[in-house]
Amino acid sequence: MTEPRIAPTRTFAARPHSTGLVVHDPLTGLTHRAGTELASGRVRLSDTDVASLPEIHPAAMQADVPISVCWSPLVRCNLACPHCLDDKSVPELARPDRYRIAHLLAESAVLGVDISGGEPLLLRELPVLIDILVAGGSAVSVTTNGTHLARRAEALAARVDAVRISLDGPDAERHDHWRGTGSFDRAVAGIRAAVAHGIPTQIQTVLLRSTAWASVRPMVELAAALGVYGVTFLQMLPIGEGAVLADAEQLTDDEATELLAELNTTSAVPVRLRTREAAGGFTVIRADGHVWRNQPDAHAINSLRPLLSINDLALTARDGSA
């Protein structure tokens, strides 16, 4: 069994806050409280050092702007997953507006930007968007279905700080049931390419009632075999295209917590649960260029305003976690 290929150091983003210096991890989406000896901005740190730092939920920081955001610059996708968070009726802005939003985020105090979709690897200008964000000091990740990752991994390796690949099952039968024939093999090929090019890589899996109990352990074992950094299990959010599945497929946060507490594996791969409660208040910039924010219970998402200036990112309630 292959264990995670962990580089001596990787890139995080740090800045001072009223609660002390904080460090955002672009791979896991977690935020940590750090000592004052760290520099602000993009910093190289070891996983061991960061793992030893206490986690702090963004809501506890009472910041003026989100610690991290998800930016979905496009709706287009080569797959049609029934549990997708995105709303396919949202219009897409043109390329110049995507550049404008990238520059706005780069000028803000947001520490982490996760570029999602749709399928972000369909964007030809993705490397340029990443470069703009990195130049502004953000830690940048890309969340992808992985089917185009093998051909784009080399170009991403010199730019992006982390990739998160969505898998819905530990094998082709279970994954392809949700994402279509052949999608598992292409996603795994993408994971292998990302790992081979030295990109910090993790698997993300949405917990679904019909599959969770049989899939959690083999998913962690697959992650170990592929040499990724970790697995994050995400509580299903009843928003976007996936809202119609909520009644049948949602687990409660207590059920999800108990499920992972009972996980029995010898793998050293780190495992994390992102609960629905933790996602309450999380900020998303959708393809229409509007700032959207999860409701406090993360059972719905609201459009707040167009993102025209940094002030439009302002928090009016608790921040949420990726």
Region locations from a protein language model:
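Radical SAM enzyme [4Fe-4S]-AdoMet core and its adjacent flexible, acidic
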Residues: 1-7, 12, 166, 176-283, ...
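Generic alpha-helical secondary-structure signal
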Residues: 101-104, 307, 316
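A broad, low-specificity signal for short, low-complexity segments enriched in glycine/proline
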Residues: 29-34, 44-47, 74-75, 124-126, ...
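N-terminal pre-core extensions flanking Radical SAM catalytic domains
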Residues: 1-88, 277-295, 310-319
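Conserved alpha-helical substructure of the radical SAM core
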Residues: 25, 45-141, 147-151
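Short low-complexity stretches enriched in small and charged residues
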Residues: 34-42, 67-72, 95-98, 116-122, ...
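Short small-residue beta-strand/loop micro-motif enriched in glycine and branched aliphatics
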Residues: 82-83, 173, 302
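Radical SAM/AdoMet-radical enzyme domain recognition
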Residues: 98-115, 123-234
